[in-house]
């Protein structure tokens, strides 16, 4: 297959689902990983896509309604999420009562937990998170409610009622987008409601967001920028520091 033909197929796939991992593209085009990475580099230079760690996305738009699958999210920005997760794990004390939000960045945090952090107690609405925490021997609470298939997050009235019964020393949150003027946002209103309820019960809140999520706006508002500190690999715009505390893992 000629390079131009591969370019067209890559852009066609992105037009349909907005994001794609290198592995997805290899399978779709029956091409090697090295070939796909060269193609992504060239298309990125041409401004036709944004190359990110583990795959590619269409050029950013100020407002988005798309939502990648849970599996796709876990394949994107892997190293960034790992560095953020390690920094977040170091903030957890044995006596903490933690809320751990559903999402790929917070799942990376669950994987990174070790030592004293394993003695903390956790409440999470992420099914995969609860399973992993339990496997690590943590004390973990999983609220009841409706399971949302796209993210494997527990949502709905029952989840809201359960979360409102707790007080958290720290909350570690995920968001699909963070933007000046729009705050922290996510595609689904019911997930946003659960996130907001947990934030309301937390003494300290950290949003784990990699640099690809800045300047992205989704339909459902979680909270404004003042409501939580940001833990990121890199903040692309210093203006965000006017609104909240930001800790970067890349110095």
Language model regions located:
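Conserved phosphate- and dinucleotide-binding cores of soluble alpha/beta proteins
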Residues: 2-12, 19-25, 30-32, 45, ...
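HTH-adjacent hinge/linker in prokaryotic transcriptional regulators
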Residues: 2-23, 28, 34, 38-99, ...
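Gly/Ser/Thr-rich loops at beta-strand to alpha-helix junctions
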Residues: 104-107
């Amino acid at each position: 297959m000629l390079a131009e033909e591969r370019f067209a197929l890559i852009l066609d796939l992105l037009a349909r689902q907005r994001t794609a991992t290198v592995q997805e593209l290899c399978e779709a085009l029956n091409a090697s990983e090295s070939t796909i990475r060269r193609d992504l580099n060239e298309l990125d230079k041409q401004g036709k896509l944004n190359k990110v760690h583990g795959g590619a996305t269409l050029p950013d738009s100020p407002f988005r309604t798309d939502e990648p699958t849970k599996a796709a999210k876990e394949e994107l920005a892997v190293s960034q999420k790992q560095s953020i997760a390690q920094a977040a794990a170091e903030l957890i004390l044995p006596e903490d009562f933690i809320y751990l939000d559903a999402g790929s960045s917070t799942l990376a945090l669950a994987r990174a937990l070790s030592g004293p952090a394993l003695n903390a107690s956790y409440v999470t609405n992420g099914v995969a998170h609860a399973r992993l925490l339990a496997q690590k021997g943590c004390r973990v609470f999983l609220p009841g409610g409706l399971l949302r298939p796209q993210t494997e997050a527990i949502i709905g009235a029952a989840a809201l009622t359960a979360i409102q019964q707790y007080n958290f020393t720290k909350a570690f949150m995920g968001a699909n987008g963070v933007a000046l003027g729009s705050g922290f946002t996510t595609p689904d209103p019911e997930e946003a409601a659960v996130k907001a309820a947990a934030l309301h019960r937390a003494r300290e809140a950290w949003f784990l967001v990699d640099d690809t999520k800045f300047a992205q706006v989704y339909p459902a508002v979680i909270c404004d920028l003042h409501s939580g500190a940001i833990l990121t690999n890199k903040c692309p715009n210093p203006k965000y520091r006017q609104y909240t505390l930001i800790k970067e893992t890349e110095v």
